[in-house]
């Protein structure tokens, strides 16, 4: 049973509050896919989190594309498409296809699949499909594909929830069960990465209370941080810098502009107003107090050691290095 009772902070008729409706939909975490198709005038590719399996026999999958997408006509005309599931080190690939570049495929490595659809190099998995059916669903077209070829690599998926990229980690309750099992075998020390994950869970939950009290969403908080002390940035630059979904960034920027916390500058760039800077400074002050409280019982020498260990970890060779 959950220890915390949750009450809705927004709700109602989705037609009168489409942004709130989209935020509610965004609470469901998904993976991140790039859907591709061949074309006479060049391949098409879009990011999509609407991917789902439909059937094992026959092997069917589906995804959907908005009618206003610039690639909609290409996918309507193509008899094939491929769904590429991104790994957790492919945020950059996702951002390329979510952005407005005219020649996205020149910015990533790819090869041609069995059906002629592009397959993204180093993707965690792919499903190469022939289009089985198309159905209209509101402002989207639902594409059903029959999988004729697939592939899977070892690794972890890139995740997406509430406008933010993420990674998959074991739940703390699962970690507790694993720790208990470790004790049975005399393995008393917690794995280093497990400790980092638990510290992140605690910090994020504690700071979420302050964000909510200030009326700021997680995406909004990151936008304030990204603009604070920075030259004016575009929505695309903010999304890349803070690892956020561009659409969520645009929505939050519009709300901040309406509230007077952000101002629109030349060339589609945005900057914090004095009100926005004050709001960010209040958050910094709270985080500083929170840090002091959490670390009060830890000696300066131990903090120094922990800091150096984490800095060395962050500066390490990274995934896939030999």
UniProtKB/Swiss-Prot annotation:
Its EC number is 1.5.1.42. One of its GO terms (molecular function) is riboflavin reductase (NADPH) activity. The keyword Transcription does not apply. It is an enzyme of class 1 (oxidoreductase). It comes from the Bacteria. Keywords: Flavoprotein, FMN, NAD, Oxidoreductase. Pfam families: Flavin_Reduct. Transmembrane segments: none annotated. The keyword Calcium does not apply. Gene3D superfamilies: Electron Transport, Fmn-binding Protein, Chain A, Winged helix-like DNA-binding domain superfamily/Winged helix DNA-binding domain. It catalyses: FMNH2 + NAD(+) = FMN + NADH + 2 H(+). Residues 1-20 are annotated as: Disordered. Heterodimer of two subunits, A and B. Catalyzes the NADH-dependent reduction of the FMN cofactor of the nitrilotriacetate monooxygenase subunit A. PANTHER family: FLAVIN REDUCTASE (PTHR30466), FLAVIN-DEPENDENT MONOOXYGENASE, REDUCTASE SUBUNIT HSAB (PTHR30466:SF11). Belongs to the non-flavoprotein flavin reductase family. This is FMN reductase (NADH) NtaB. It comes from Aminobacter aminovorans.
